[in-house]
Amino acid sequence: MTVLNEQNTMQMLQYIRVFLSKQQDSMLKLLETMVQIESGNTDKAGCDTMCSLVEGELRALQVETRRVPMSEKGDFLHGVWGDCYPGAPILFSGHMDTVFPKGTLRNIPFRIHDGKAFGPGCLDMKAGLVVAIFALRALQESGFC
């Protein structure tokens, strides 16, 4: 466990900045993979596929996951990591469904244009899921816990 003080907090933040700057390609690849999964809010199979992907990403980071099966909507996913640091926990919260119906990818495929990513669910909230996963990865790499 790292005891944080002003000096090592600044060192850790610098390490995290450098680490994340080197992860851009990996982050975009994961975002593209997520966007390619059509997970409209009425598409249980698509939402469950997204849940499996996120669960796999979290488990690869040694996050203890618990999946809550749902009968009509996509499954819920709960993950816990980092109980080795005293103090307030860090909460990542999000959703894996989109408002886009199945088939939208044919007309609105994933693309990068002028440094911005586009595609169904890109903004709400698949990019947020990627950010959360890579934030956790950065914390682990920095020795936070």
Predicted regions and their residues:
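Acidic/histidine-rich catalytic neighborhood of metal-dependent amide-processing enzymes
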Residues: 126-145
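Acidic/His- and Gly-rich active-site-bordering loop/insert found
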Residues: 8-120, 141-145
